[in-house]
């Protein structure tokens, strides 16, 4: 019998639900990957009952797709839920692991963030353990950066995690700007941002408003989304491409700051939606002097986080629901 795990993930951007079917018996083996879109309005909804229902129903649908021919070999499902709010001592996720377990007849690991907090962690980022499992090796130093809605990093030296933290906004401000101007859900390849100009004065103001955040930390999305409201007057006077260009540079600066904090390691590996933003990656490569690559040679960047939660379920680092 195979020992398979299903990992699910909907990030802070809420753009889709990703899932993968994996095995850890002889290193990581990815058997299947799928993505489902959410119903209209999910991305910006404040209705927790709607969010609860949607993430639960879509998760059941996605699990059933992934395990169609392997159901008897699945040990557990990793369901992190949809983060509603997060701070260092409590995390709130939407979704029902109990219903998923009952409907699929498969045990579900969930409440990963509060489990981590209860065991001395900050509840985020949770992916460093998977970074270590996947990428650490003797005689190397690597910085692994996940650019999701929020950007987080893991600094690996030899086979150890030296440091990990949330470090700044990833795609969240870019996606919000696109929505606010009715330009779509995201800026494909950073094409619109690449046509804009950086507002240096505004960039320095944005940096000053979040410069006091310490490492290590776990950031709630509201920390960065509040920048839009705080600086509304300045944004009202600017073209969307200039706002996008300036927000892109904000992400670049926060990545550079953490890169320097970690001692400027020679190798930097990226994954997450931001790694597919050509303009953002172009600016990162111009700013950071390191060997830069993406994780895609090991696993598709899009499914790293869902595989990471499957790994945490495999290691039993969550609450089990049957």
Protein language model annotation of sequence segments:
Residues 68-73, 243, 258, 262, ...:
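Non-transmembrane, aqueous-exposed alpha-helical and coiled segments at domain scale
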Residues 1-6:
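Extreme N-terminal starter segment of soluble prokaryotic enzymes
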Residues 20-69:
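Glycine-rich nucleotide/cofactor/substrate-binding loop typically near the N-terminus or early
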Residues 17-20, 31-46, 103, 109-136, ...:
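Glycine-rich phosphate-binding loop plus the immediately following alpha-helix
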Residues 184-267, 277-289:
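A contiguous, well-structured pocket-lining segment that forms one wall/lid of small-molecule binding clefts
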Residues 50-97:
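Short beta-strand-loop/turn "lid" adjacent to the catalytic site in phosphate-handling enzymes
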Residues 10, 79-82, 147-149, 266-276, ...:
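Glycine-rich beta-strand-to-loop/alpha-helix junction loops that act as flexible
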Residues 10-14, 245, 249, 296-322:
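Glycine-rich phosphate-binding/hydrolytic loop that grips phosphoryl groups
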């Amino acid at each position: 019998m195979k020992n398979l795990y299903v990992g699910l993930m909907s990030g802070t951007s809420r753009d889709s639900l990703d899932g993968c079917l994996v095995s850890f018996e002889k290193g990581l083996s990815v058997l299947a990957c799928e993505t489902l879109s959410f119903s209209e309005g999910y991305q910006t909804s404040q209705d927790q009952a709607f969010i609860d229902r949607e993430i639960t129903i879509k998760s059941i649908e996605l699990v059933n797709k992934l395990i169609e021919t392997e159901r008897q070999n699945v040990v557990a499902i990793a369901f992190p839920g949809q983060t509603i709010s997060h701070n260092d001592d409590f995390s709130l996720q939407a979704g029902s692991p109990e219903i998923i377990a009952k409907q699929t007849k498969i045990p579900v690991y969930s409440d990963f963030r509060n489990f981590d907090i209860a065991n001395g962690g900050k509840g985020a980022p949770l992916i460093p353990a998977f970074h270590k499992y996947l990428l650490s090796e003797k005689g190397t130093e690597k910085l692994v950066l996940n650019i999701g809605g929020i950007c987080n990093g893991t600094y690996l030296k030899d086979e150890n995690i030296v440091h990990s933290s949330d470090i700044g906004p990833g795609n969240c401000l870019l996606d919000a700007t696109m929505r606010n101007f009715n330009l779509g859900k995201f800026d494909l390849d950073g094409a619109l941002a690449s046509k804009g100009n950086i507002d240096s004065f505004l960039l320095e103001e944005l940096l000053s408003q979040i410069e006091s955040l310490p490492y290590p930390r776990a950031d709630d999305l509201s920390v960065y989304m509040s920048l839009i409201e705080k600086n509304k007057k300045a944004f009202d006077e600017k073209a969307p491409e200039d706002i996008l260009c300036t927000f892109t540079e904000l992400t670049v600066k926060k990545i550079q700051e953490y890169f320097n904090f970690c001692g400027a390691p020679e190798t930097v590996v990226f994954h997450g939606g931001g790694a597919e933003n050509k303009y953002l990656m172009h600016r990162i490569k111009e700013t950071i002097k390191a060997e830069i690559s993406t994780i895609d040679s090991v696993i598709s960047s899009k499914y790293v986080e869902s595989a990471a939660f499957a790994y945490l379920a495999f290691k039993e680092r969550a609450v089990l629901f049957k």
